[in-house]
Structures are given as structure tokens and as C-alpha cells.
A protein has these predicted regions:
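Charge-biased low-complexity segments
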Residues: 10-155
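N-terminal signal peptide c-region/cleavage motif recognized by signal peptidases
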Residues: 5-9
């Protein structure tokens, strides 16, 4: 099981409303109540910790990293438009990396970033419906940002 360090309190986007995909779909950030993972922040933390898997390929180089997952909480609480941003490799085994060419090191870091992005997206897609945000008493779409940290569980 993956040890995950989470910055809980997924943040919403800071704009009155933002057009997504086409002009008929709005995403709001001015709302009365924020979208909530059912069960609250502790339940969200527990869900991610339980479901997030540290990629085996990253273990060979003791790689740790962080990523920001972005997604839309729709009016019905379903999640869409899932993407990964700001993937950073925070730590790796310098002895093992120094044995690789500079080009290979760069390639490996990109591979690990992609693995973290795919795993983060897998976990977000697996989430149950959220309680949607409310604006003037009506459910609205809101863009959320969820940081996830990948830590080698063997450490």
C-alpha cells in the first residue's frame, strides 16, 4: 500500500466563471458551498491513501514526487476533465542515477512523472461522486486541485 502525504483541502479555481470545452458549459468559483468528498477531508485522505499505489518502477531508483491533480466536480457530483499538473520529482537515489547518462536521467525523470500522473488520474477516476458546490442554492460545476505526494513505502 502506498504512503501518501496529502495537502488536504482541495482548492477551487479563482475566477468568477470559466468556460470549459465549449461556450455552453460554465465552471464556477463563486459559490456558497464548496464541493465536498462524501465524508469530508479525513475520508478523502483515507480514500487516497488506501487506493494510491506507488509505481514499482519508481522503487528501483527510490524516486519520490508530487503532483497536482485537477478535475471538475459536476452538478451531479461526478468528476470529469481529470488532468495532472506540476509533477515534480522531489527525491531520487543519486548513486543509481549517477550511473546513467544525462540523457537517460532526463528520460527516467519524465517516465516517473508520467507514472505519477497516470496513478493520480486512476485514483481520481475511482472516487465516488462528491457533494457538488452550490451557487444560489443550485448545484454548479467547480474546478478542483488536489495535491498528491508519492513516497516510497519501503522507506
Amino acid at each position: 500500500m502506498m504512503l501518501a502525504s496529502l495537502t488536504i483541502g482541495a482548492a477551487a479555481q479563482n475566477a468568477d466563471s470559466t468556460r470549459v470545452k465549449n461556450d455552453s458549459i460554465k465552471v464556477f468559483s463563486d459559490y456558497e458551498s464548496q464541493p465536498q468528498f462524501r465524508g469530508g477531508q479525513e475520508a478523502l485522505k483515507k480514500f487516497i491513501s488506501k487506493n494510491l499505489k506507488y509505481p514499482d518502477a519508481a522503487a528501483a531508483y527510490d524516486v519520490e514526487g508530487s503532483i497536482i491533480m485537477t478535475f471538475i466536480v459536476n452538478e451531479d457530483g461526478s468528476l470529469s476533465d481529470i488532468s495532472a499538473h506540476d509533477c515534480k520529482i522531489d527525491r531520487f537515489n543519486t548513486t543509481k542515477f549517477s550511473q546513467e547518462t544525462e540523457a537517460r536521467q532526463k528520460e527516467l525523470k519524465q517516465q516517473f512523472a508520467l507514472l505519477f500522473a497516470k496513478e493520480g488520474a486512476r485514483v481520481i477516476r475511482k472516487m465516488p461522486k462528491w457533494a457538488p458546490a452550490k451557487r444560489y442554492g443550485k448545484a454548479v460545476r467547480v474546478k478542483m486541485h488536489q495535491p498528491i505526494k508519492f513516497i516510497d513505502p519501503s522507506k
